Amino acid sequence: QAKEMGLYVLPMPFMIDGTEYLEDINLTQKEFYEHLSGDHDVSTSQPSPETILNLWEKLLEEYDAVVHIPMSSGLSSSCQTAKMLADDFDGKVQVADNHRISVTQRRSVQDALDMAAAGMDAEAICKKLEETGLDSTIYITVDTLKYLKKGGRITPAAAALGTLLRLKPVLTIQGEKLDAFAKARTMKQARSMMITAITRDLENQFDD
């Protein structure tokens, strides 16, 4: 889909039982979730500086500037790495930390394409993306607390208690934070909570 939109995507590295995989290159989303649901040691990494620099240099052979849209700086160190690397490109690479991830990050990419089509330059696009970064919220729920504990998002004691009570946490992502939003006893209840929250957000955002 990225190719059809004229985009260039850096694949996200995953470590599974000590072996590195690249998203959508030698590991499909289906395979990733199969490993995640099984008893495997799964963790994420970030694209190497060499991979990032090689892509930028290749793009600048064809384009005047690059707008790089990484994951939120609060959720991944890949943003800070990109900003440090961009310092050596004299403004030709603009790294937009617009505090988004997943579907909202994709929305930012589409917004950047629209702004480029309207004639805005890379610096202006980057500035606008950062100004509007907090305009969206993601709600998620998880079936297991294992990876929240592993990533340090919750304490081992909280994970043990939540597992014992079979709680399904509803989490919210806005800006740099992954926060607890609510606790549900079933996935059905968790989904209902998320739908209610999204509906309320839409009503508040478009109440005019």
Predicted segments — roles?
Residues 29-32, 49-52, 82, 109, ...:
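A general structural signal for well-ordered alpha-helical segments in protein cores
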Residues 51-79:
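N-terminal glycine-rich phosphate/adenylate-binding segment common to multiple enzyme folds
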